[in-house]
Amino acid sequence: MRILISNDDGVTAPGIAALHAALADYAECAVIAPDQDKSGASSSLTLDRPLHPQTLANGFISLNGTPTDCVHLGLNGLLPQAPDMVVSGINLGANLGDDVLYSGTVAAALEGRFLGGTSLAFSLLSRQPDNLPTAAYIARRLVEAQSRLALPPRTVLNVNIPNLPLEHIRGIQLTRLGHRARAAAPTKVVNPRGKEGYWIAVAGDAEDGGPGTDFHAVMQGYVSITPLQLDRTFNDAFEQLDGWLEGLL
């Protein structure tokens, strides 16, 4: 098996090193990741300049682009052989609920949908790497198990791991996405030359975080697995929209 590993924290981030180490003796692993932190890049592609891959001393490939750029190139000729699976992470920080709309970690896994199989995105609920061994162990177990599972084509598994030692993890729960409250207003700043700017505020707290959601699972000490798909069609709105459209043109 050949696995393409990427992330949005950057090619030198501890999470991607831990993920590679966990999978290296299970599959033939290639790492293509951004040359800097690209958190919040979502599924953006770089279209205004050429992309220049550079192979680092450890064999990882650094790219001056987004997580989606990395996987796109990995699936389209940058690697000697196409991968069988895309695995993204391990992100330092949660990707829960609405986070998946902005997350470069999840976007890298979504780009892997073109392989037709299942991709996985892993996130640890901490900005610190102390419990990366827990997350890496769980990632290895899930990648191994997923290879024996027949899911619908183009499924992405979004995995969030509590910031706990392995012995304190209570198990795994299958969850739906919760929802966050609206984020605080951007923070206005003025530099020493008087030029105004803004910092985007941190994500809002869980607004829909009850039982069954990814928020609830991780807060109770469980690993959360949420199956995602690209199709965002709101089918329940079709009936009302059909009536609304009548006679417009």
From Swiss-Prot:
EC numbers on record: 3.1.3.5
Record-given protein name: 5'-nucleotidase SurE
Keywords: Cytoplasm, Hydrolase, Metal-binding, Nucleotide-binding
Taxon lineage: Bacteria, Pseudomonadati, Pseudomonadota, Gammaproteobacteria, Pseudomonadales
Family according to the record: Belongs to the SurE nucleotidase family.
Binding annotation for a divalent metal cation: 8-9, 39, 91
Co-factor: note: Binds 1 divalent metal cation per subunit.
Gene: surE
Origin superkingdom: Bacteria
Catalytic activity: a ribonucleoside 5'-phosphate + H2O = a ribonucleoside + phosphate
Function summary: Nucleotidase that shows phosphatase activity on nucleoside 5'-monophosphates.
Principal place of residence: cytoplasm
GO molecular function, one term: 5'-nucleotidase activity
Transmembrane segments: none
Cofactor: a divalent metal cation
GO cellular component: cytoplasm
InterPro entries, per database record: SurE, SurE-like_Pase/nucleotidase, SurE-like_sf
Subcellular locations according to the entry: Cytoplasm
Naturally occurring in which organism (per UniProt): Pseudomonas putida (strain GB-1)
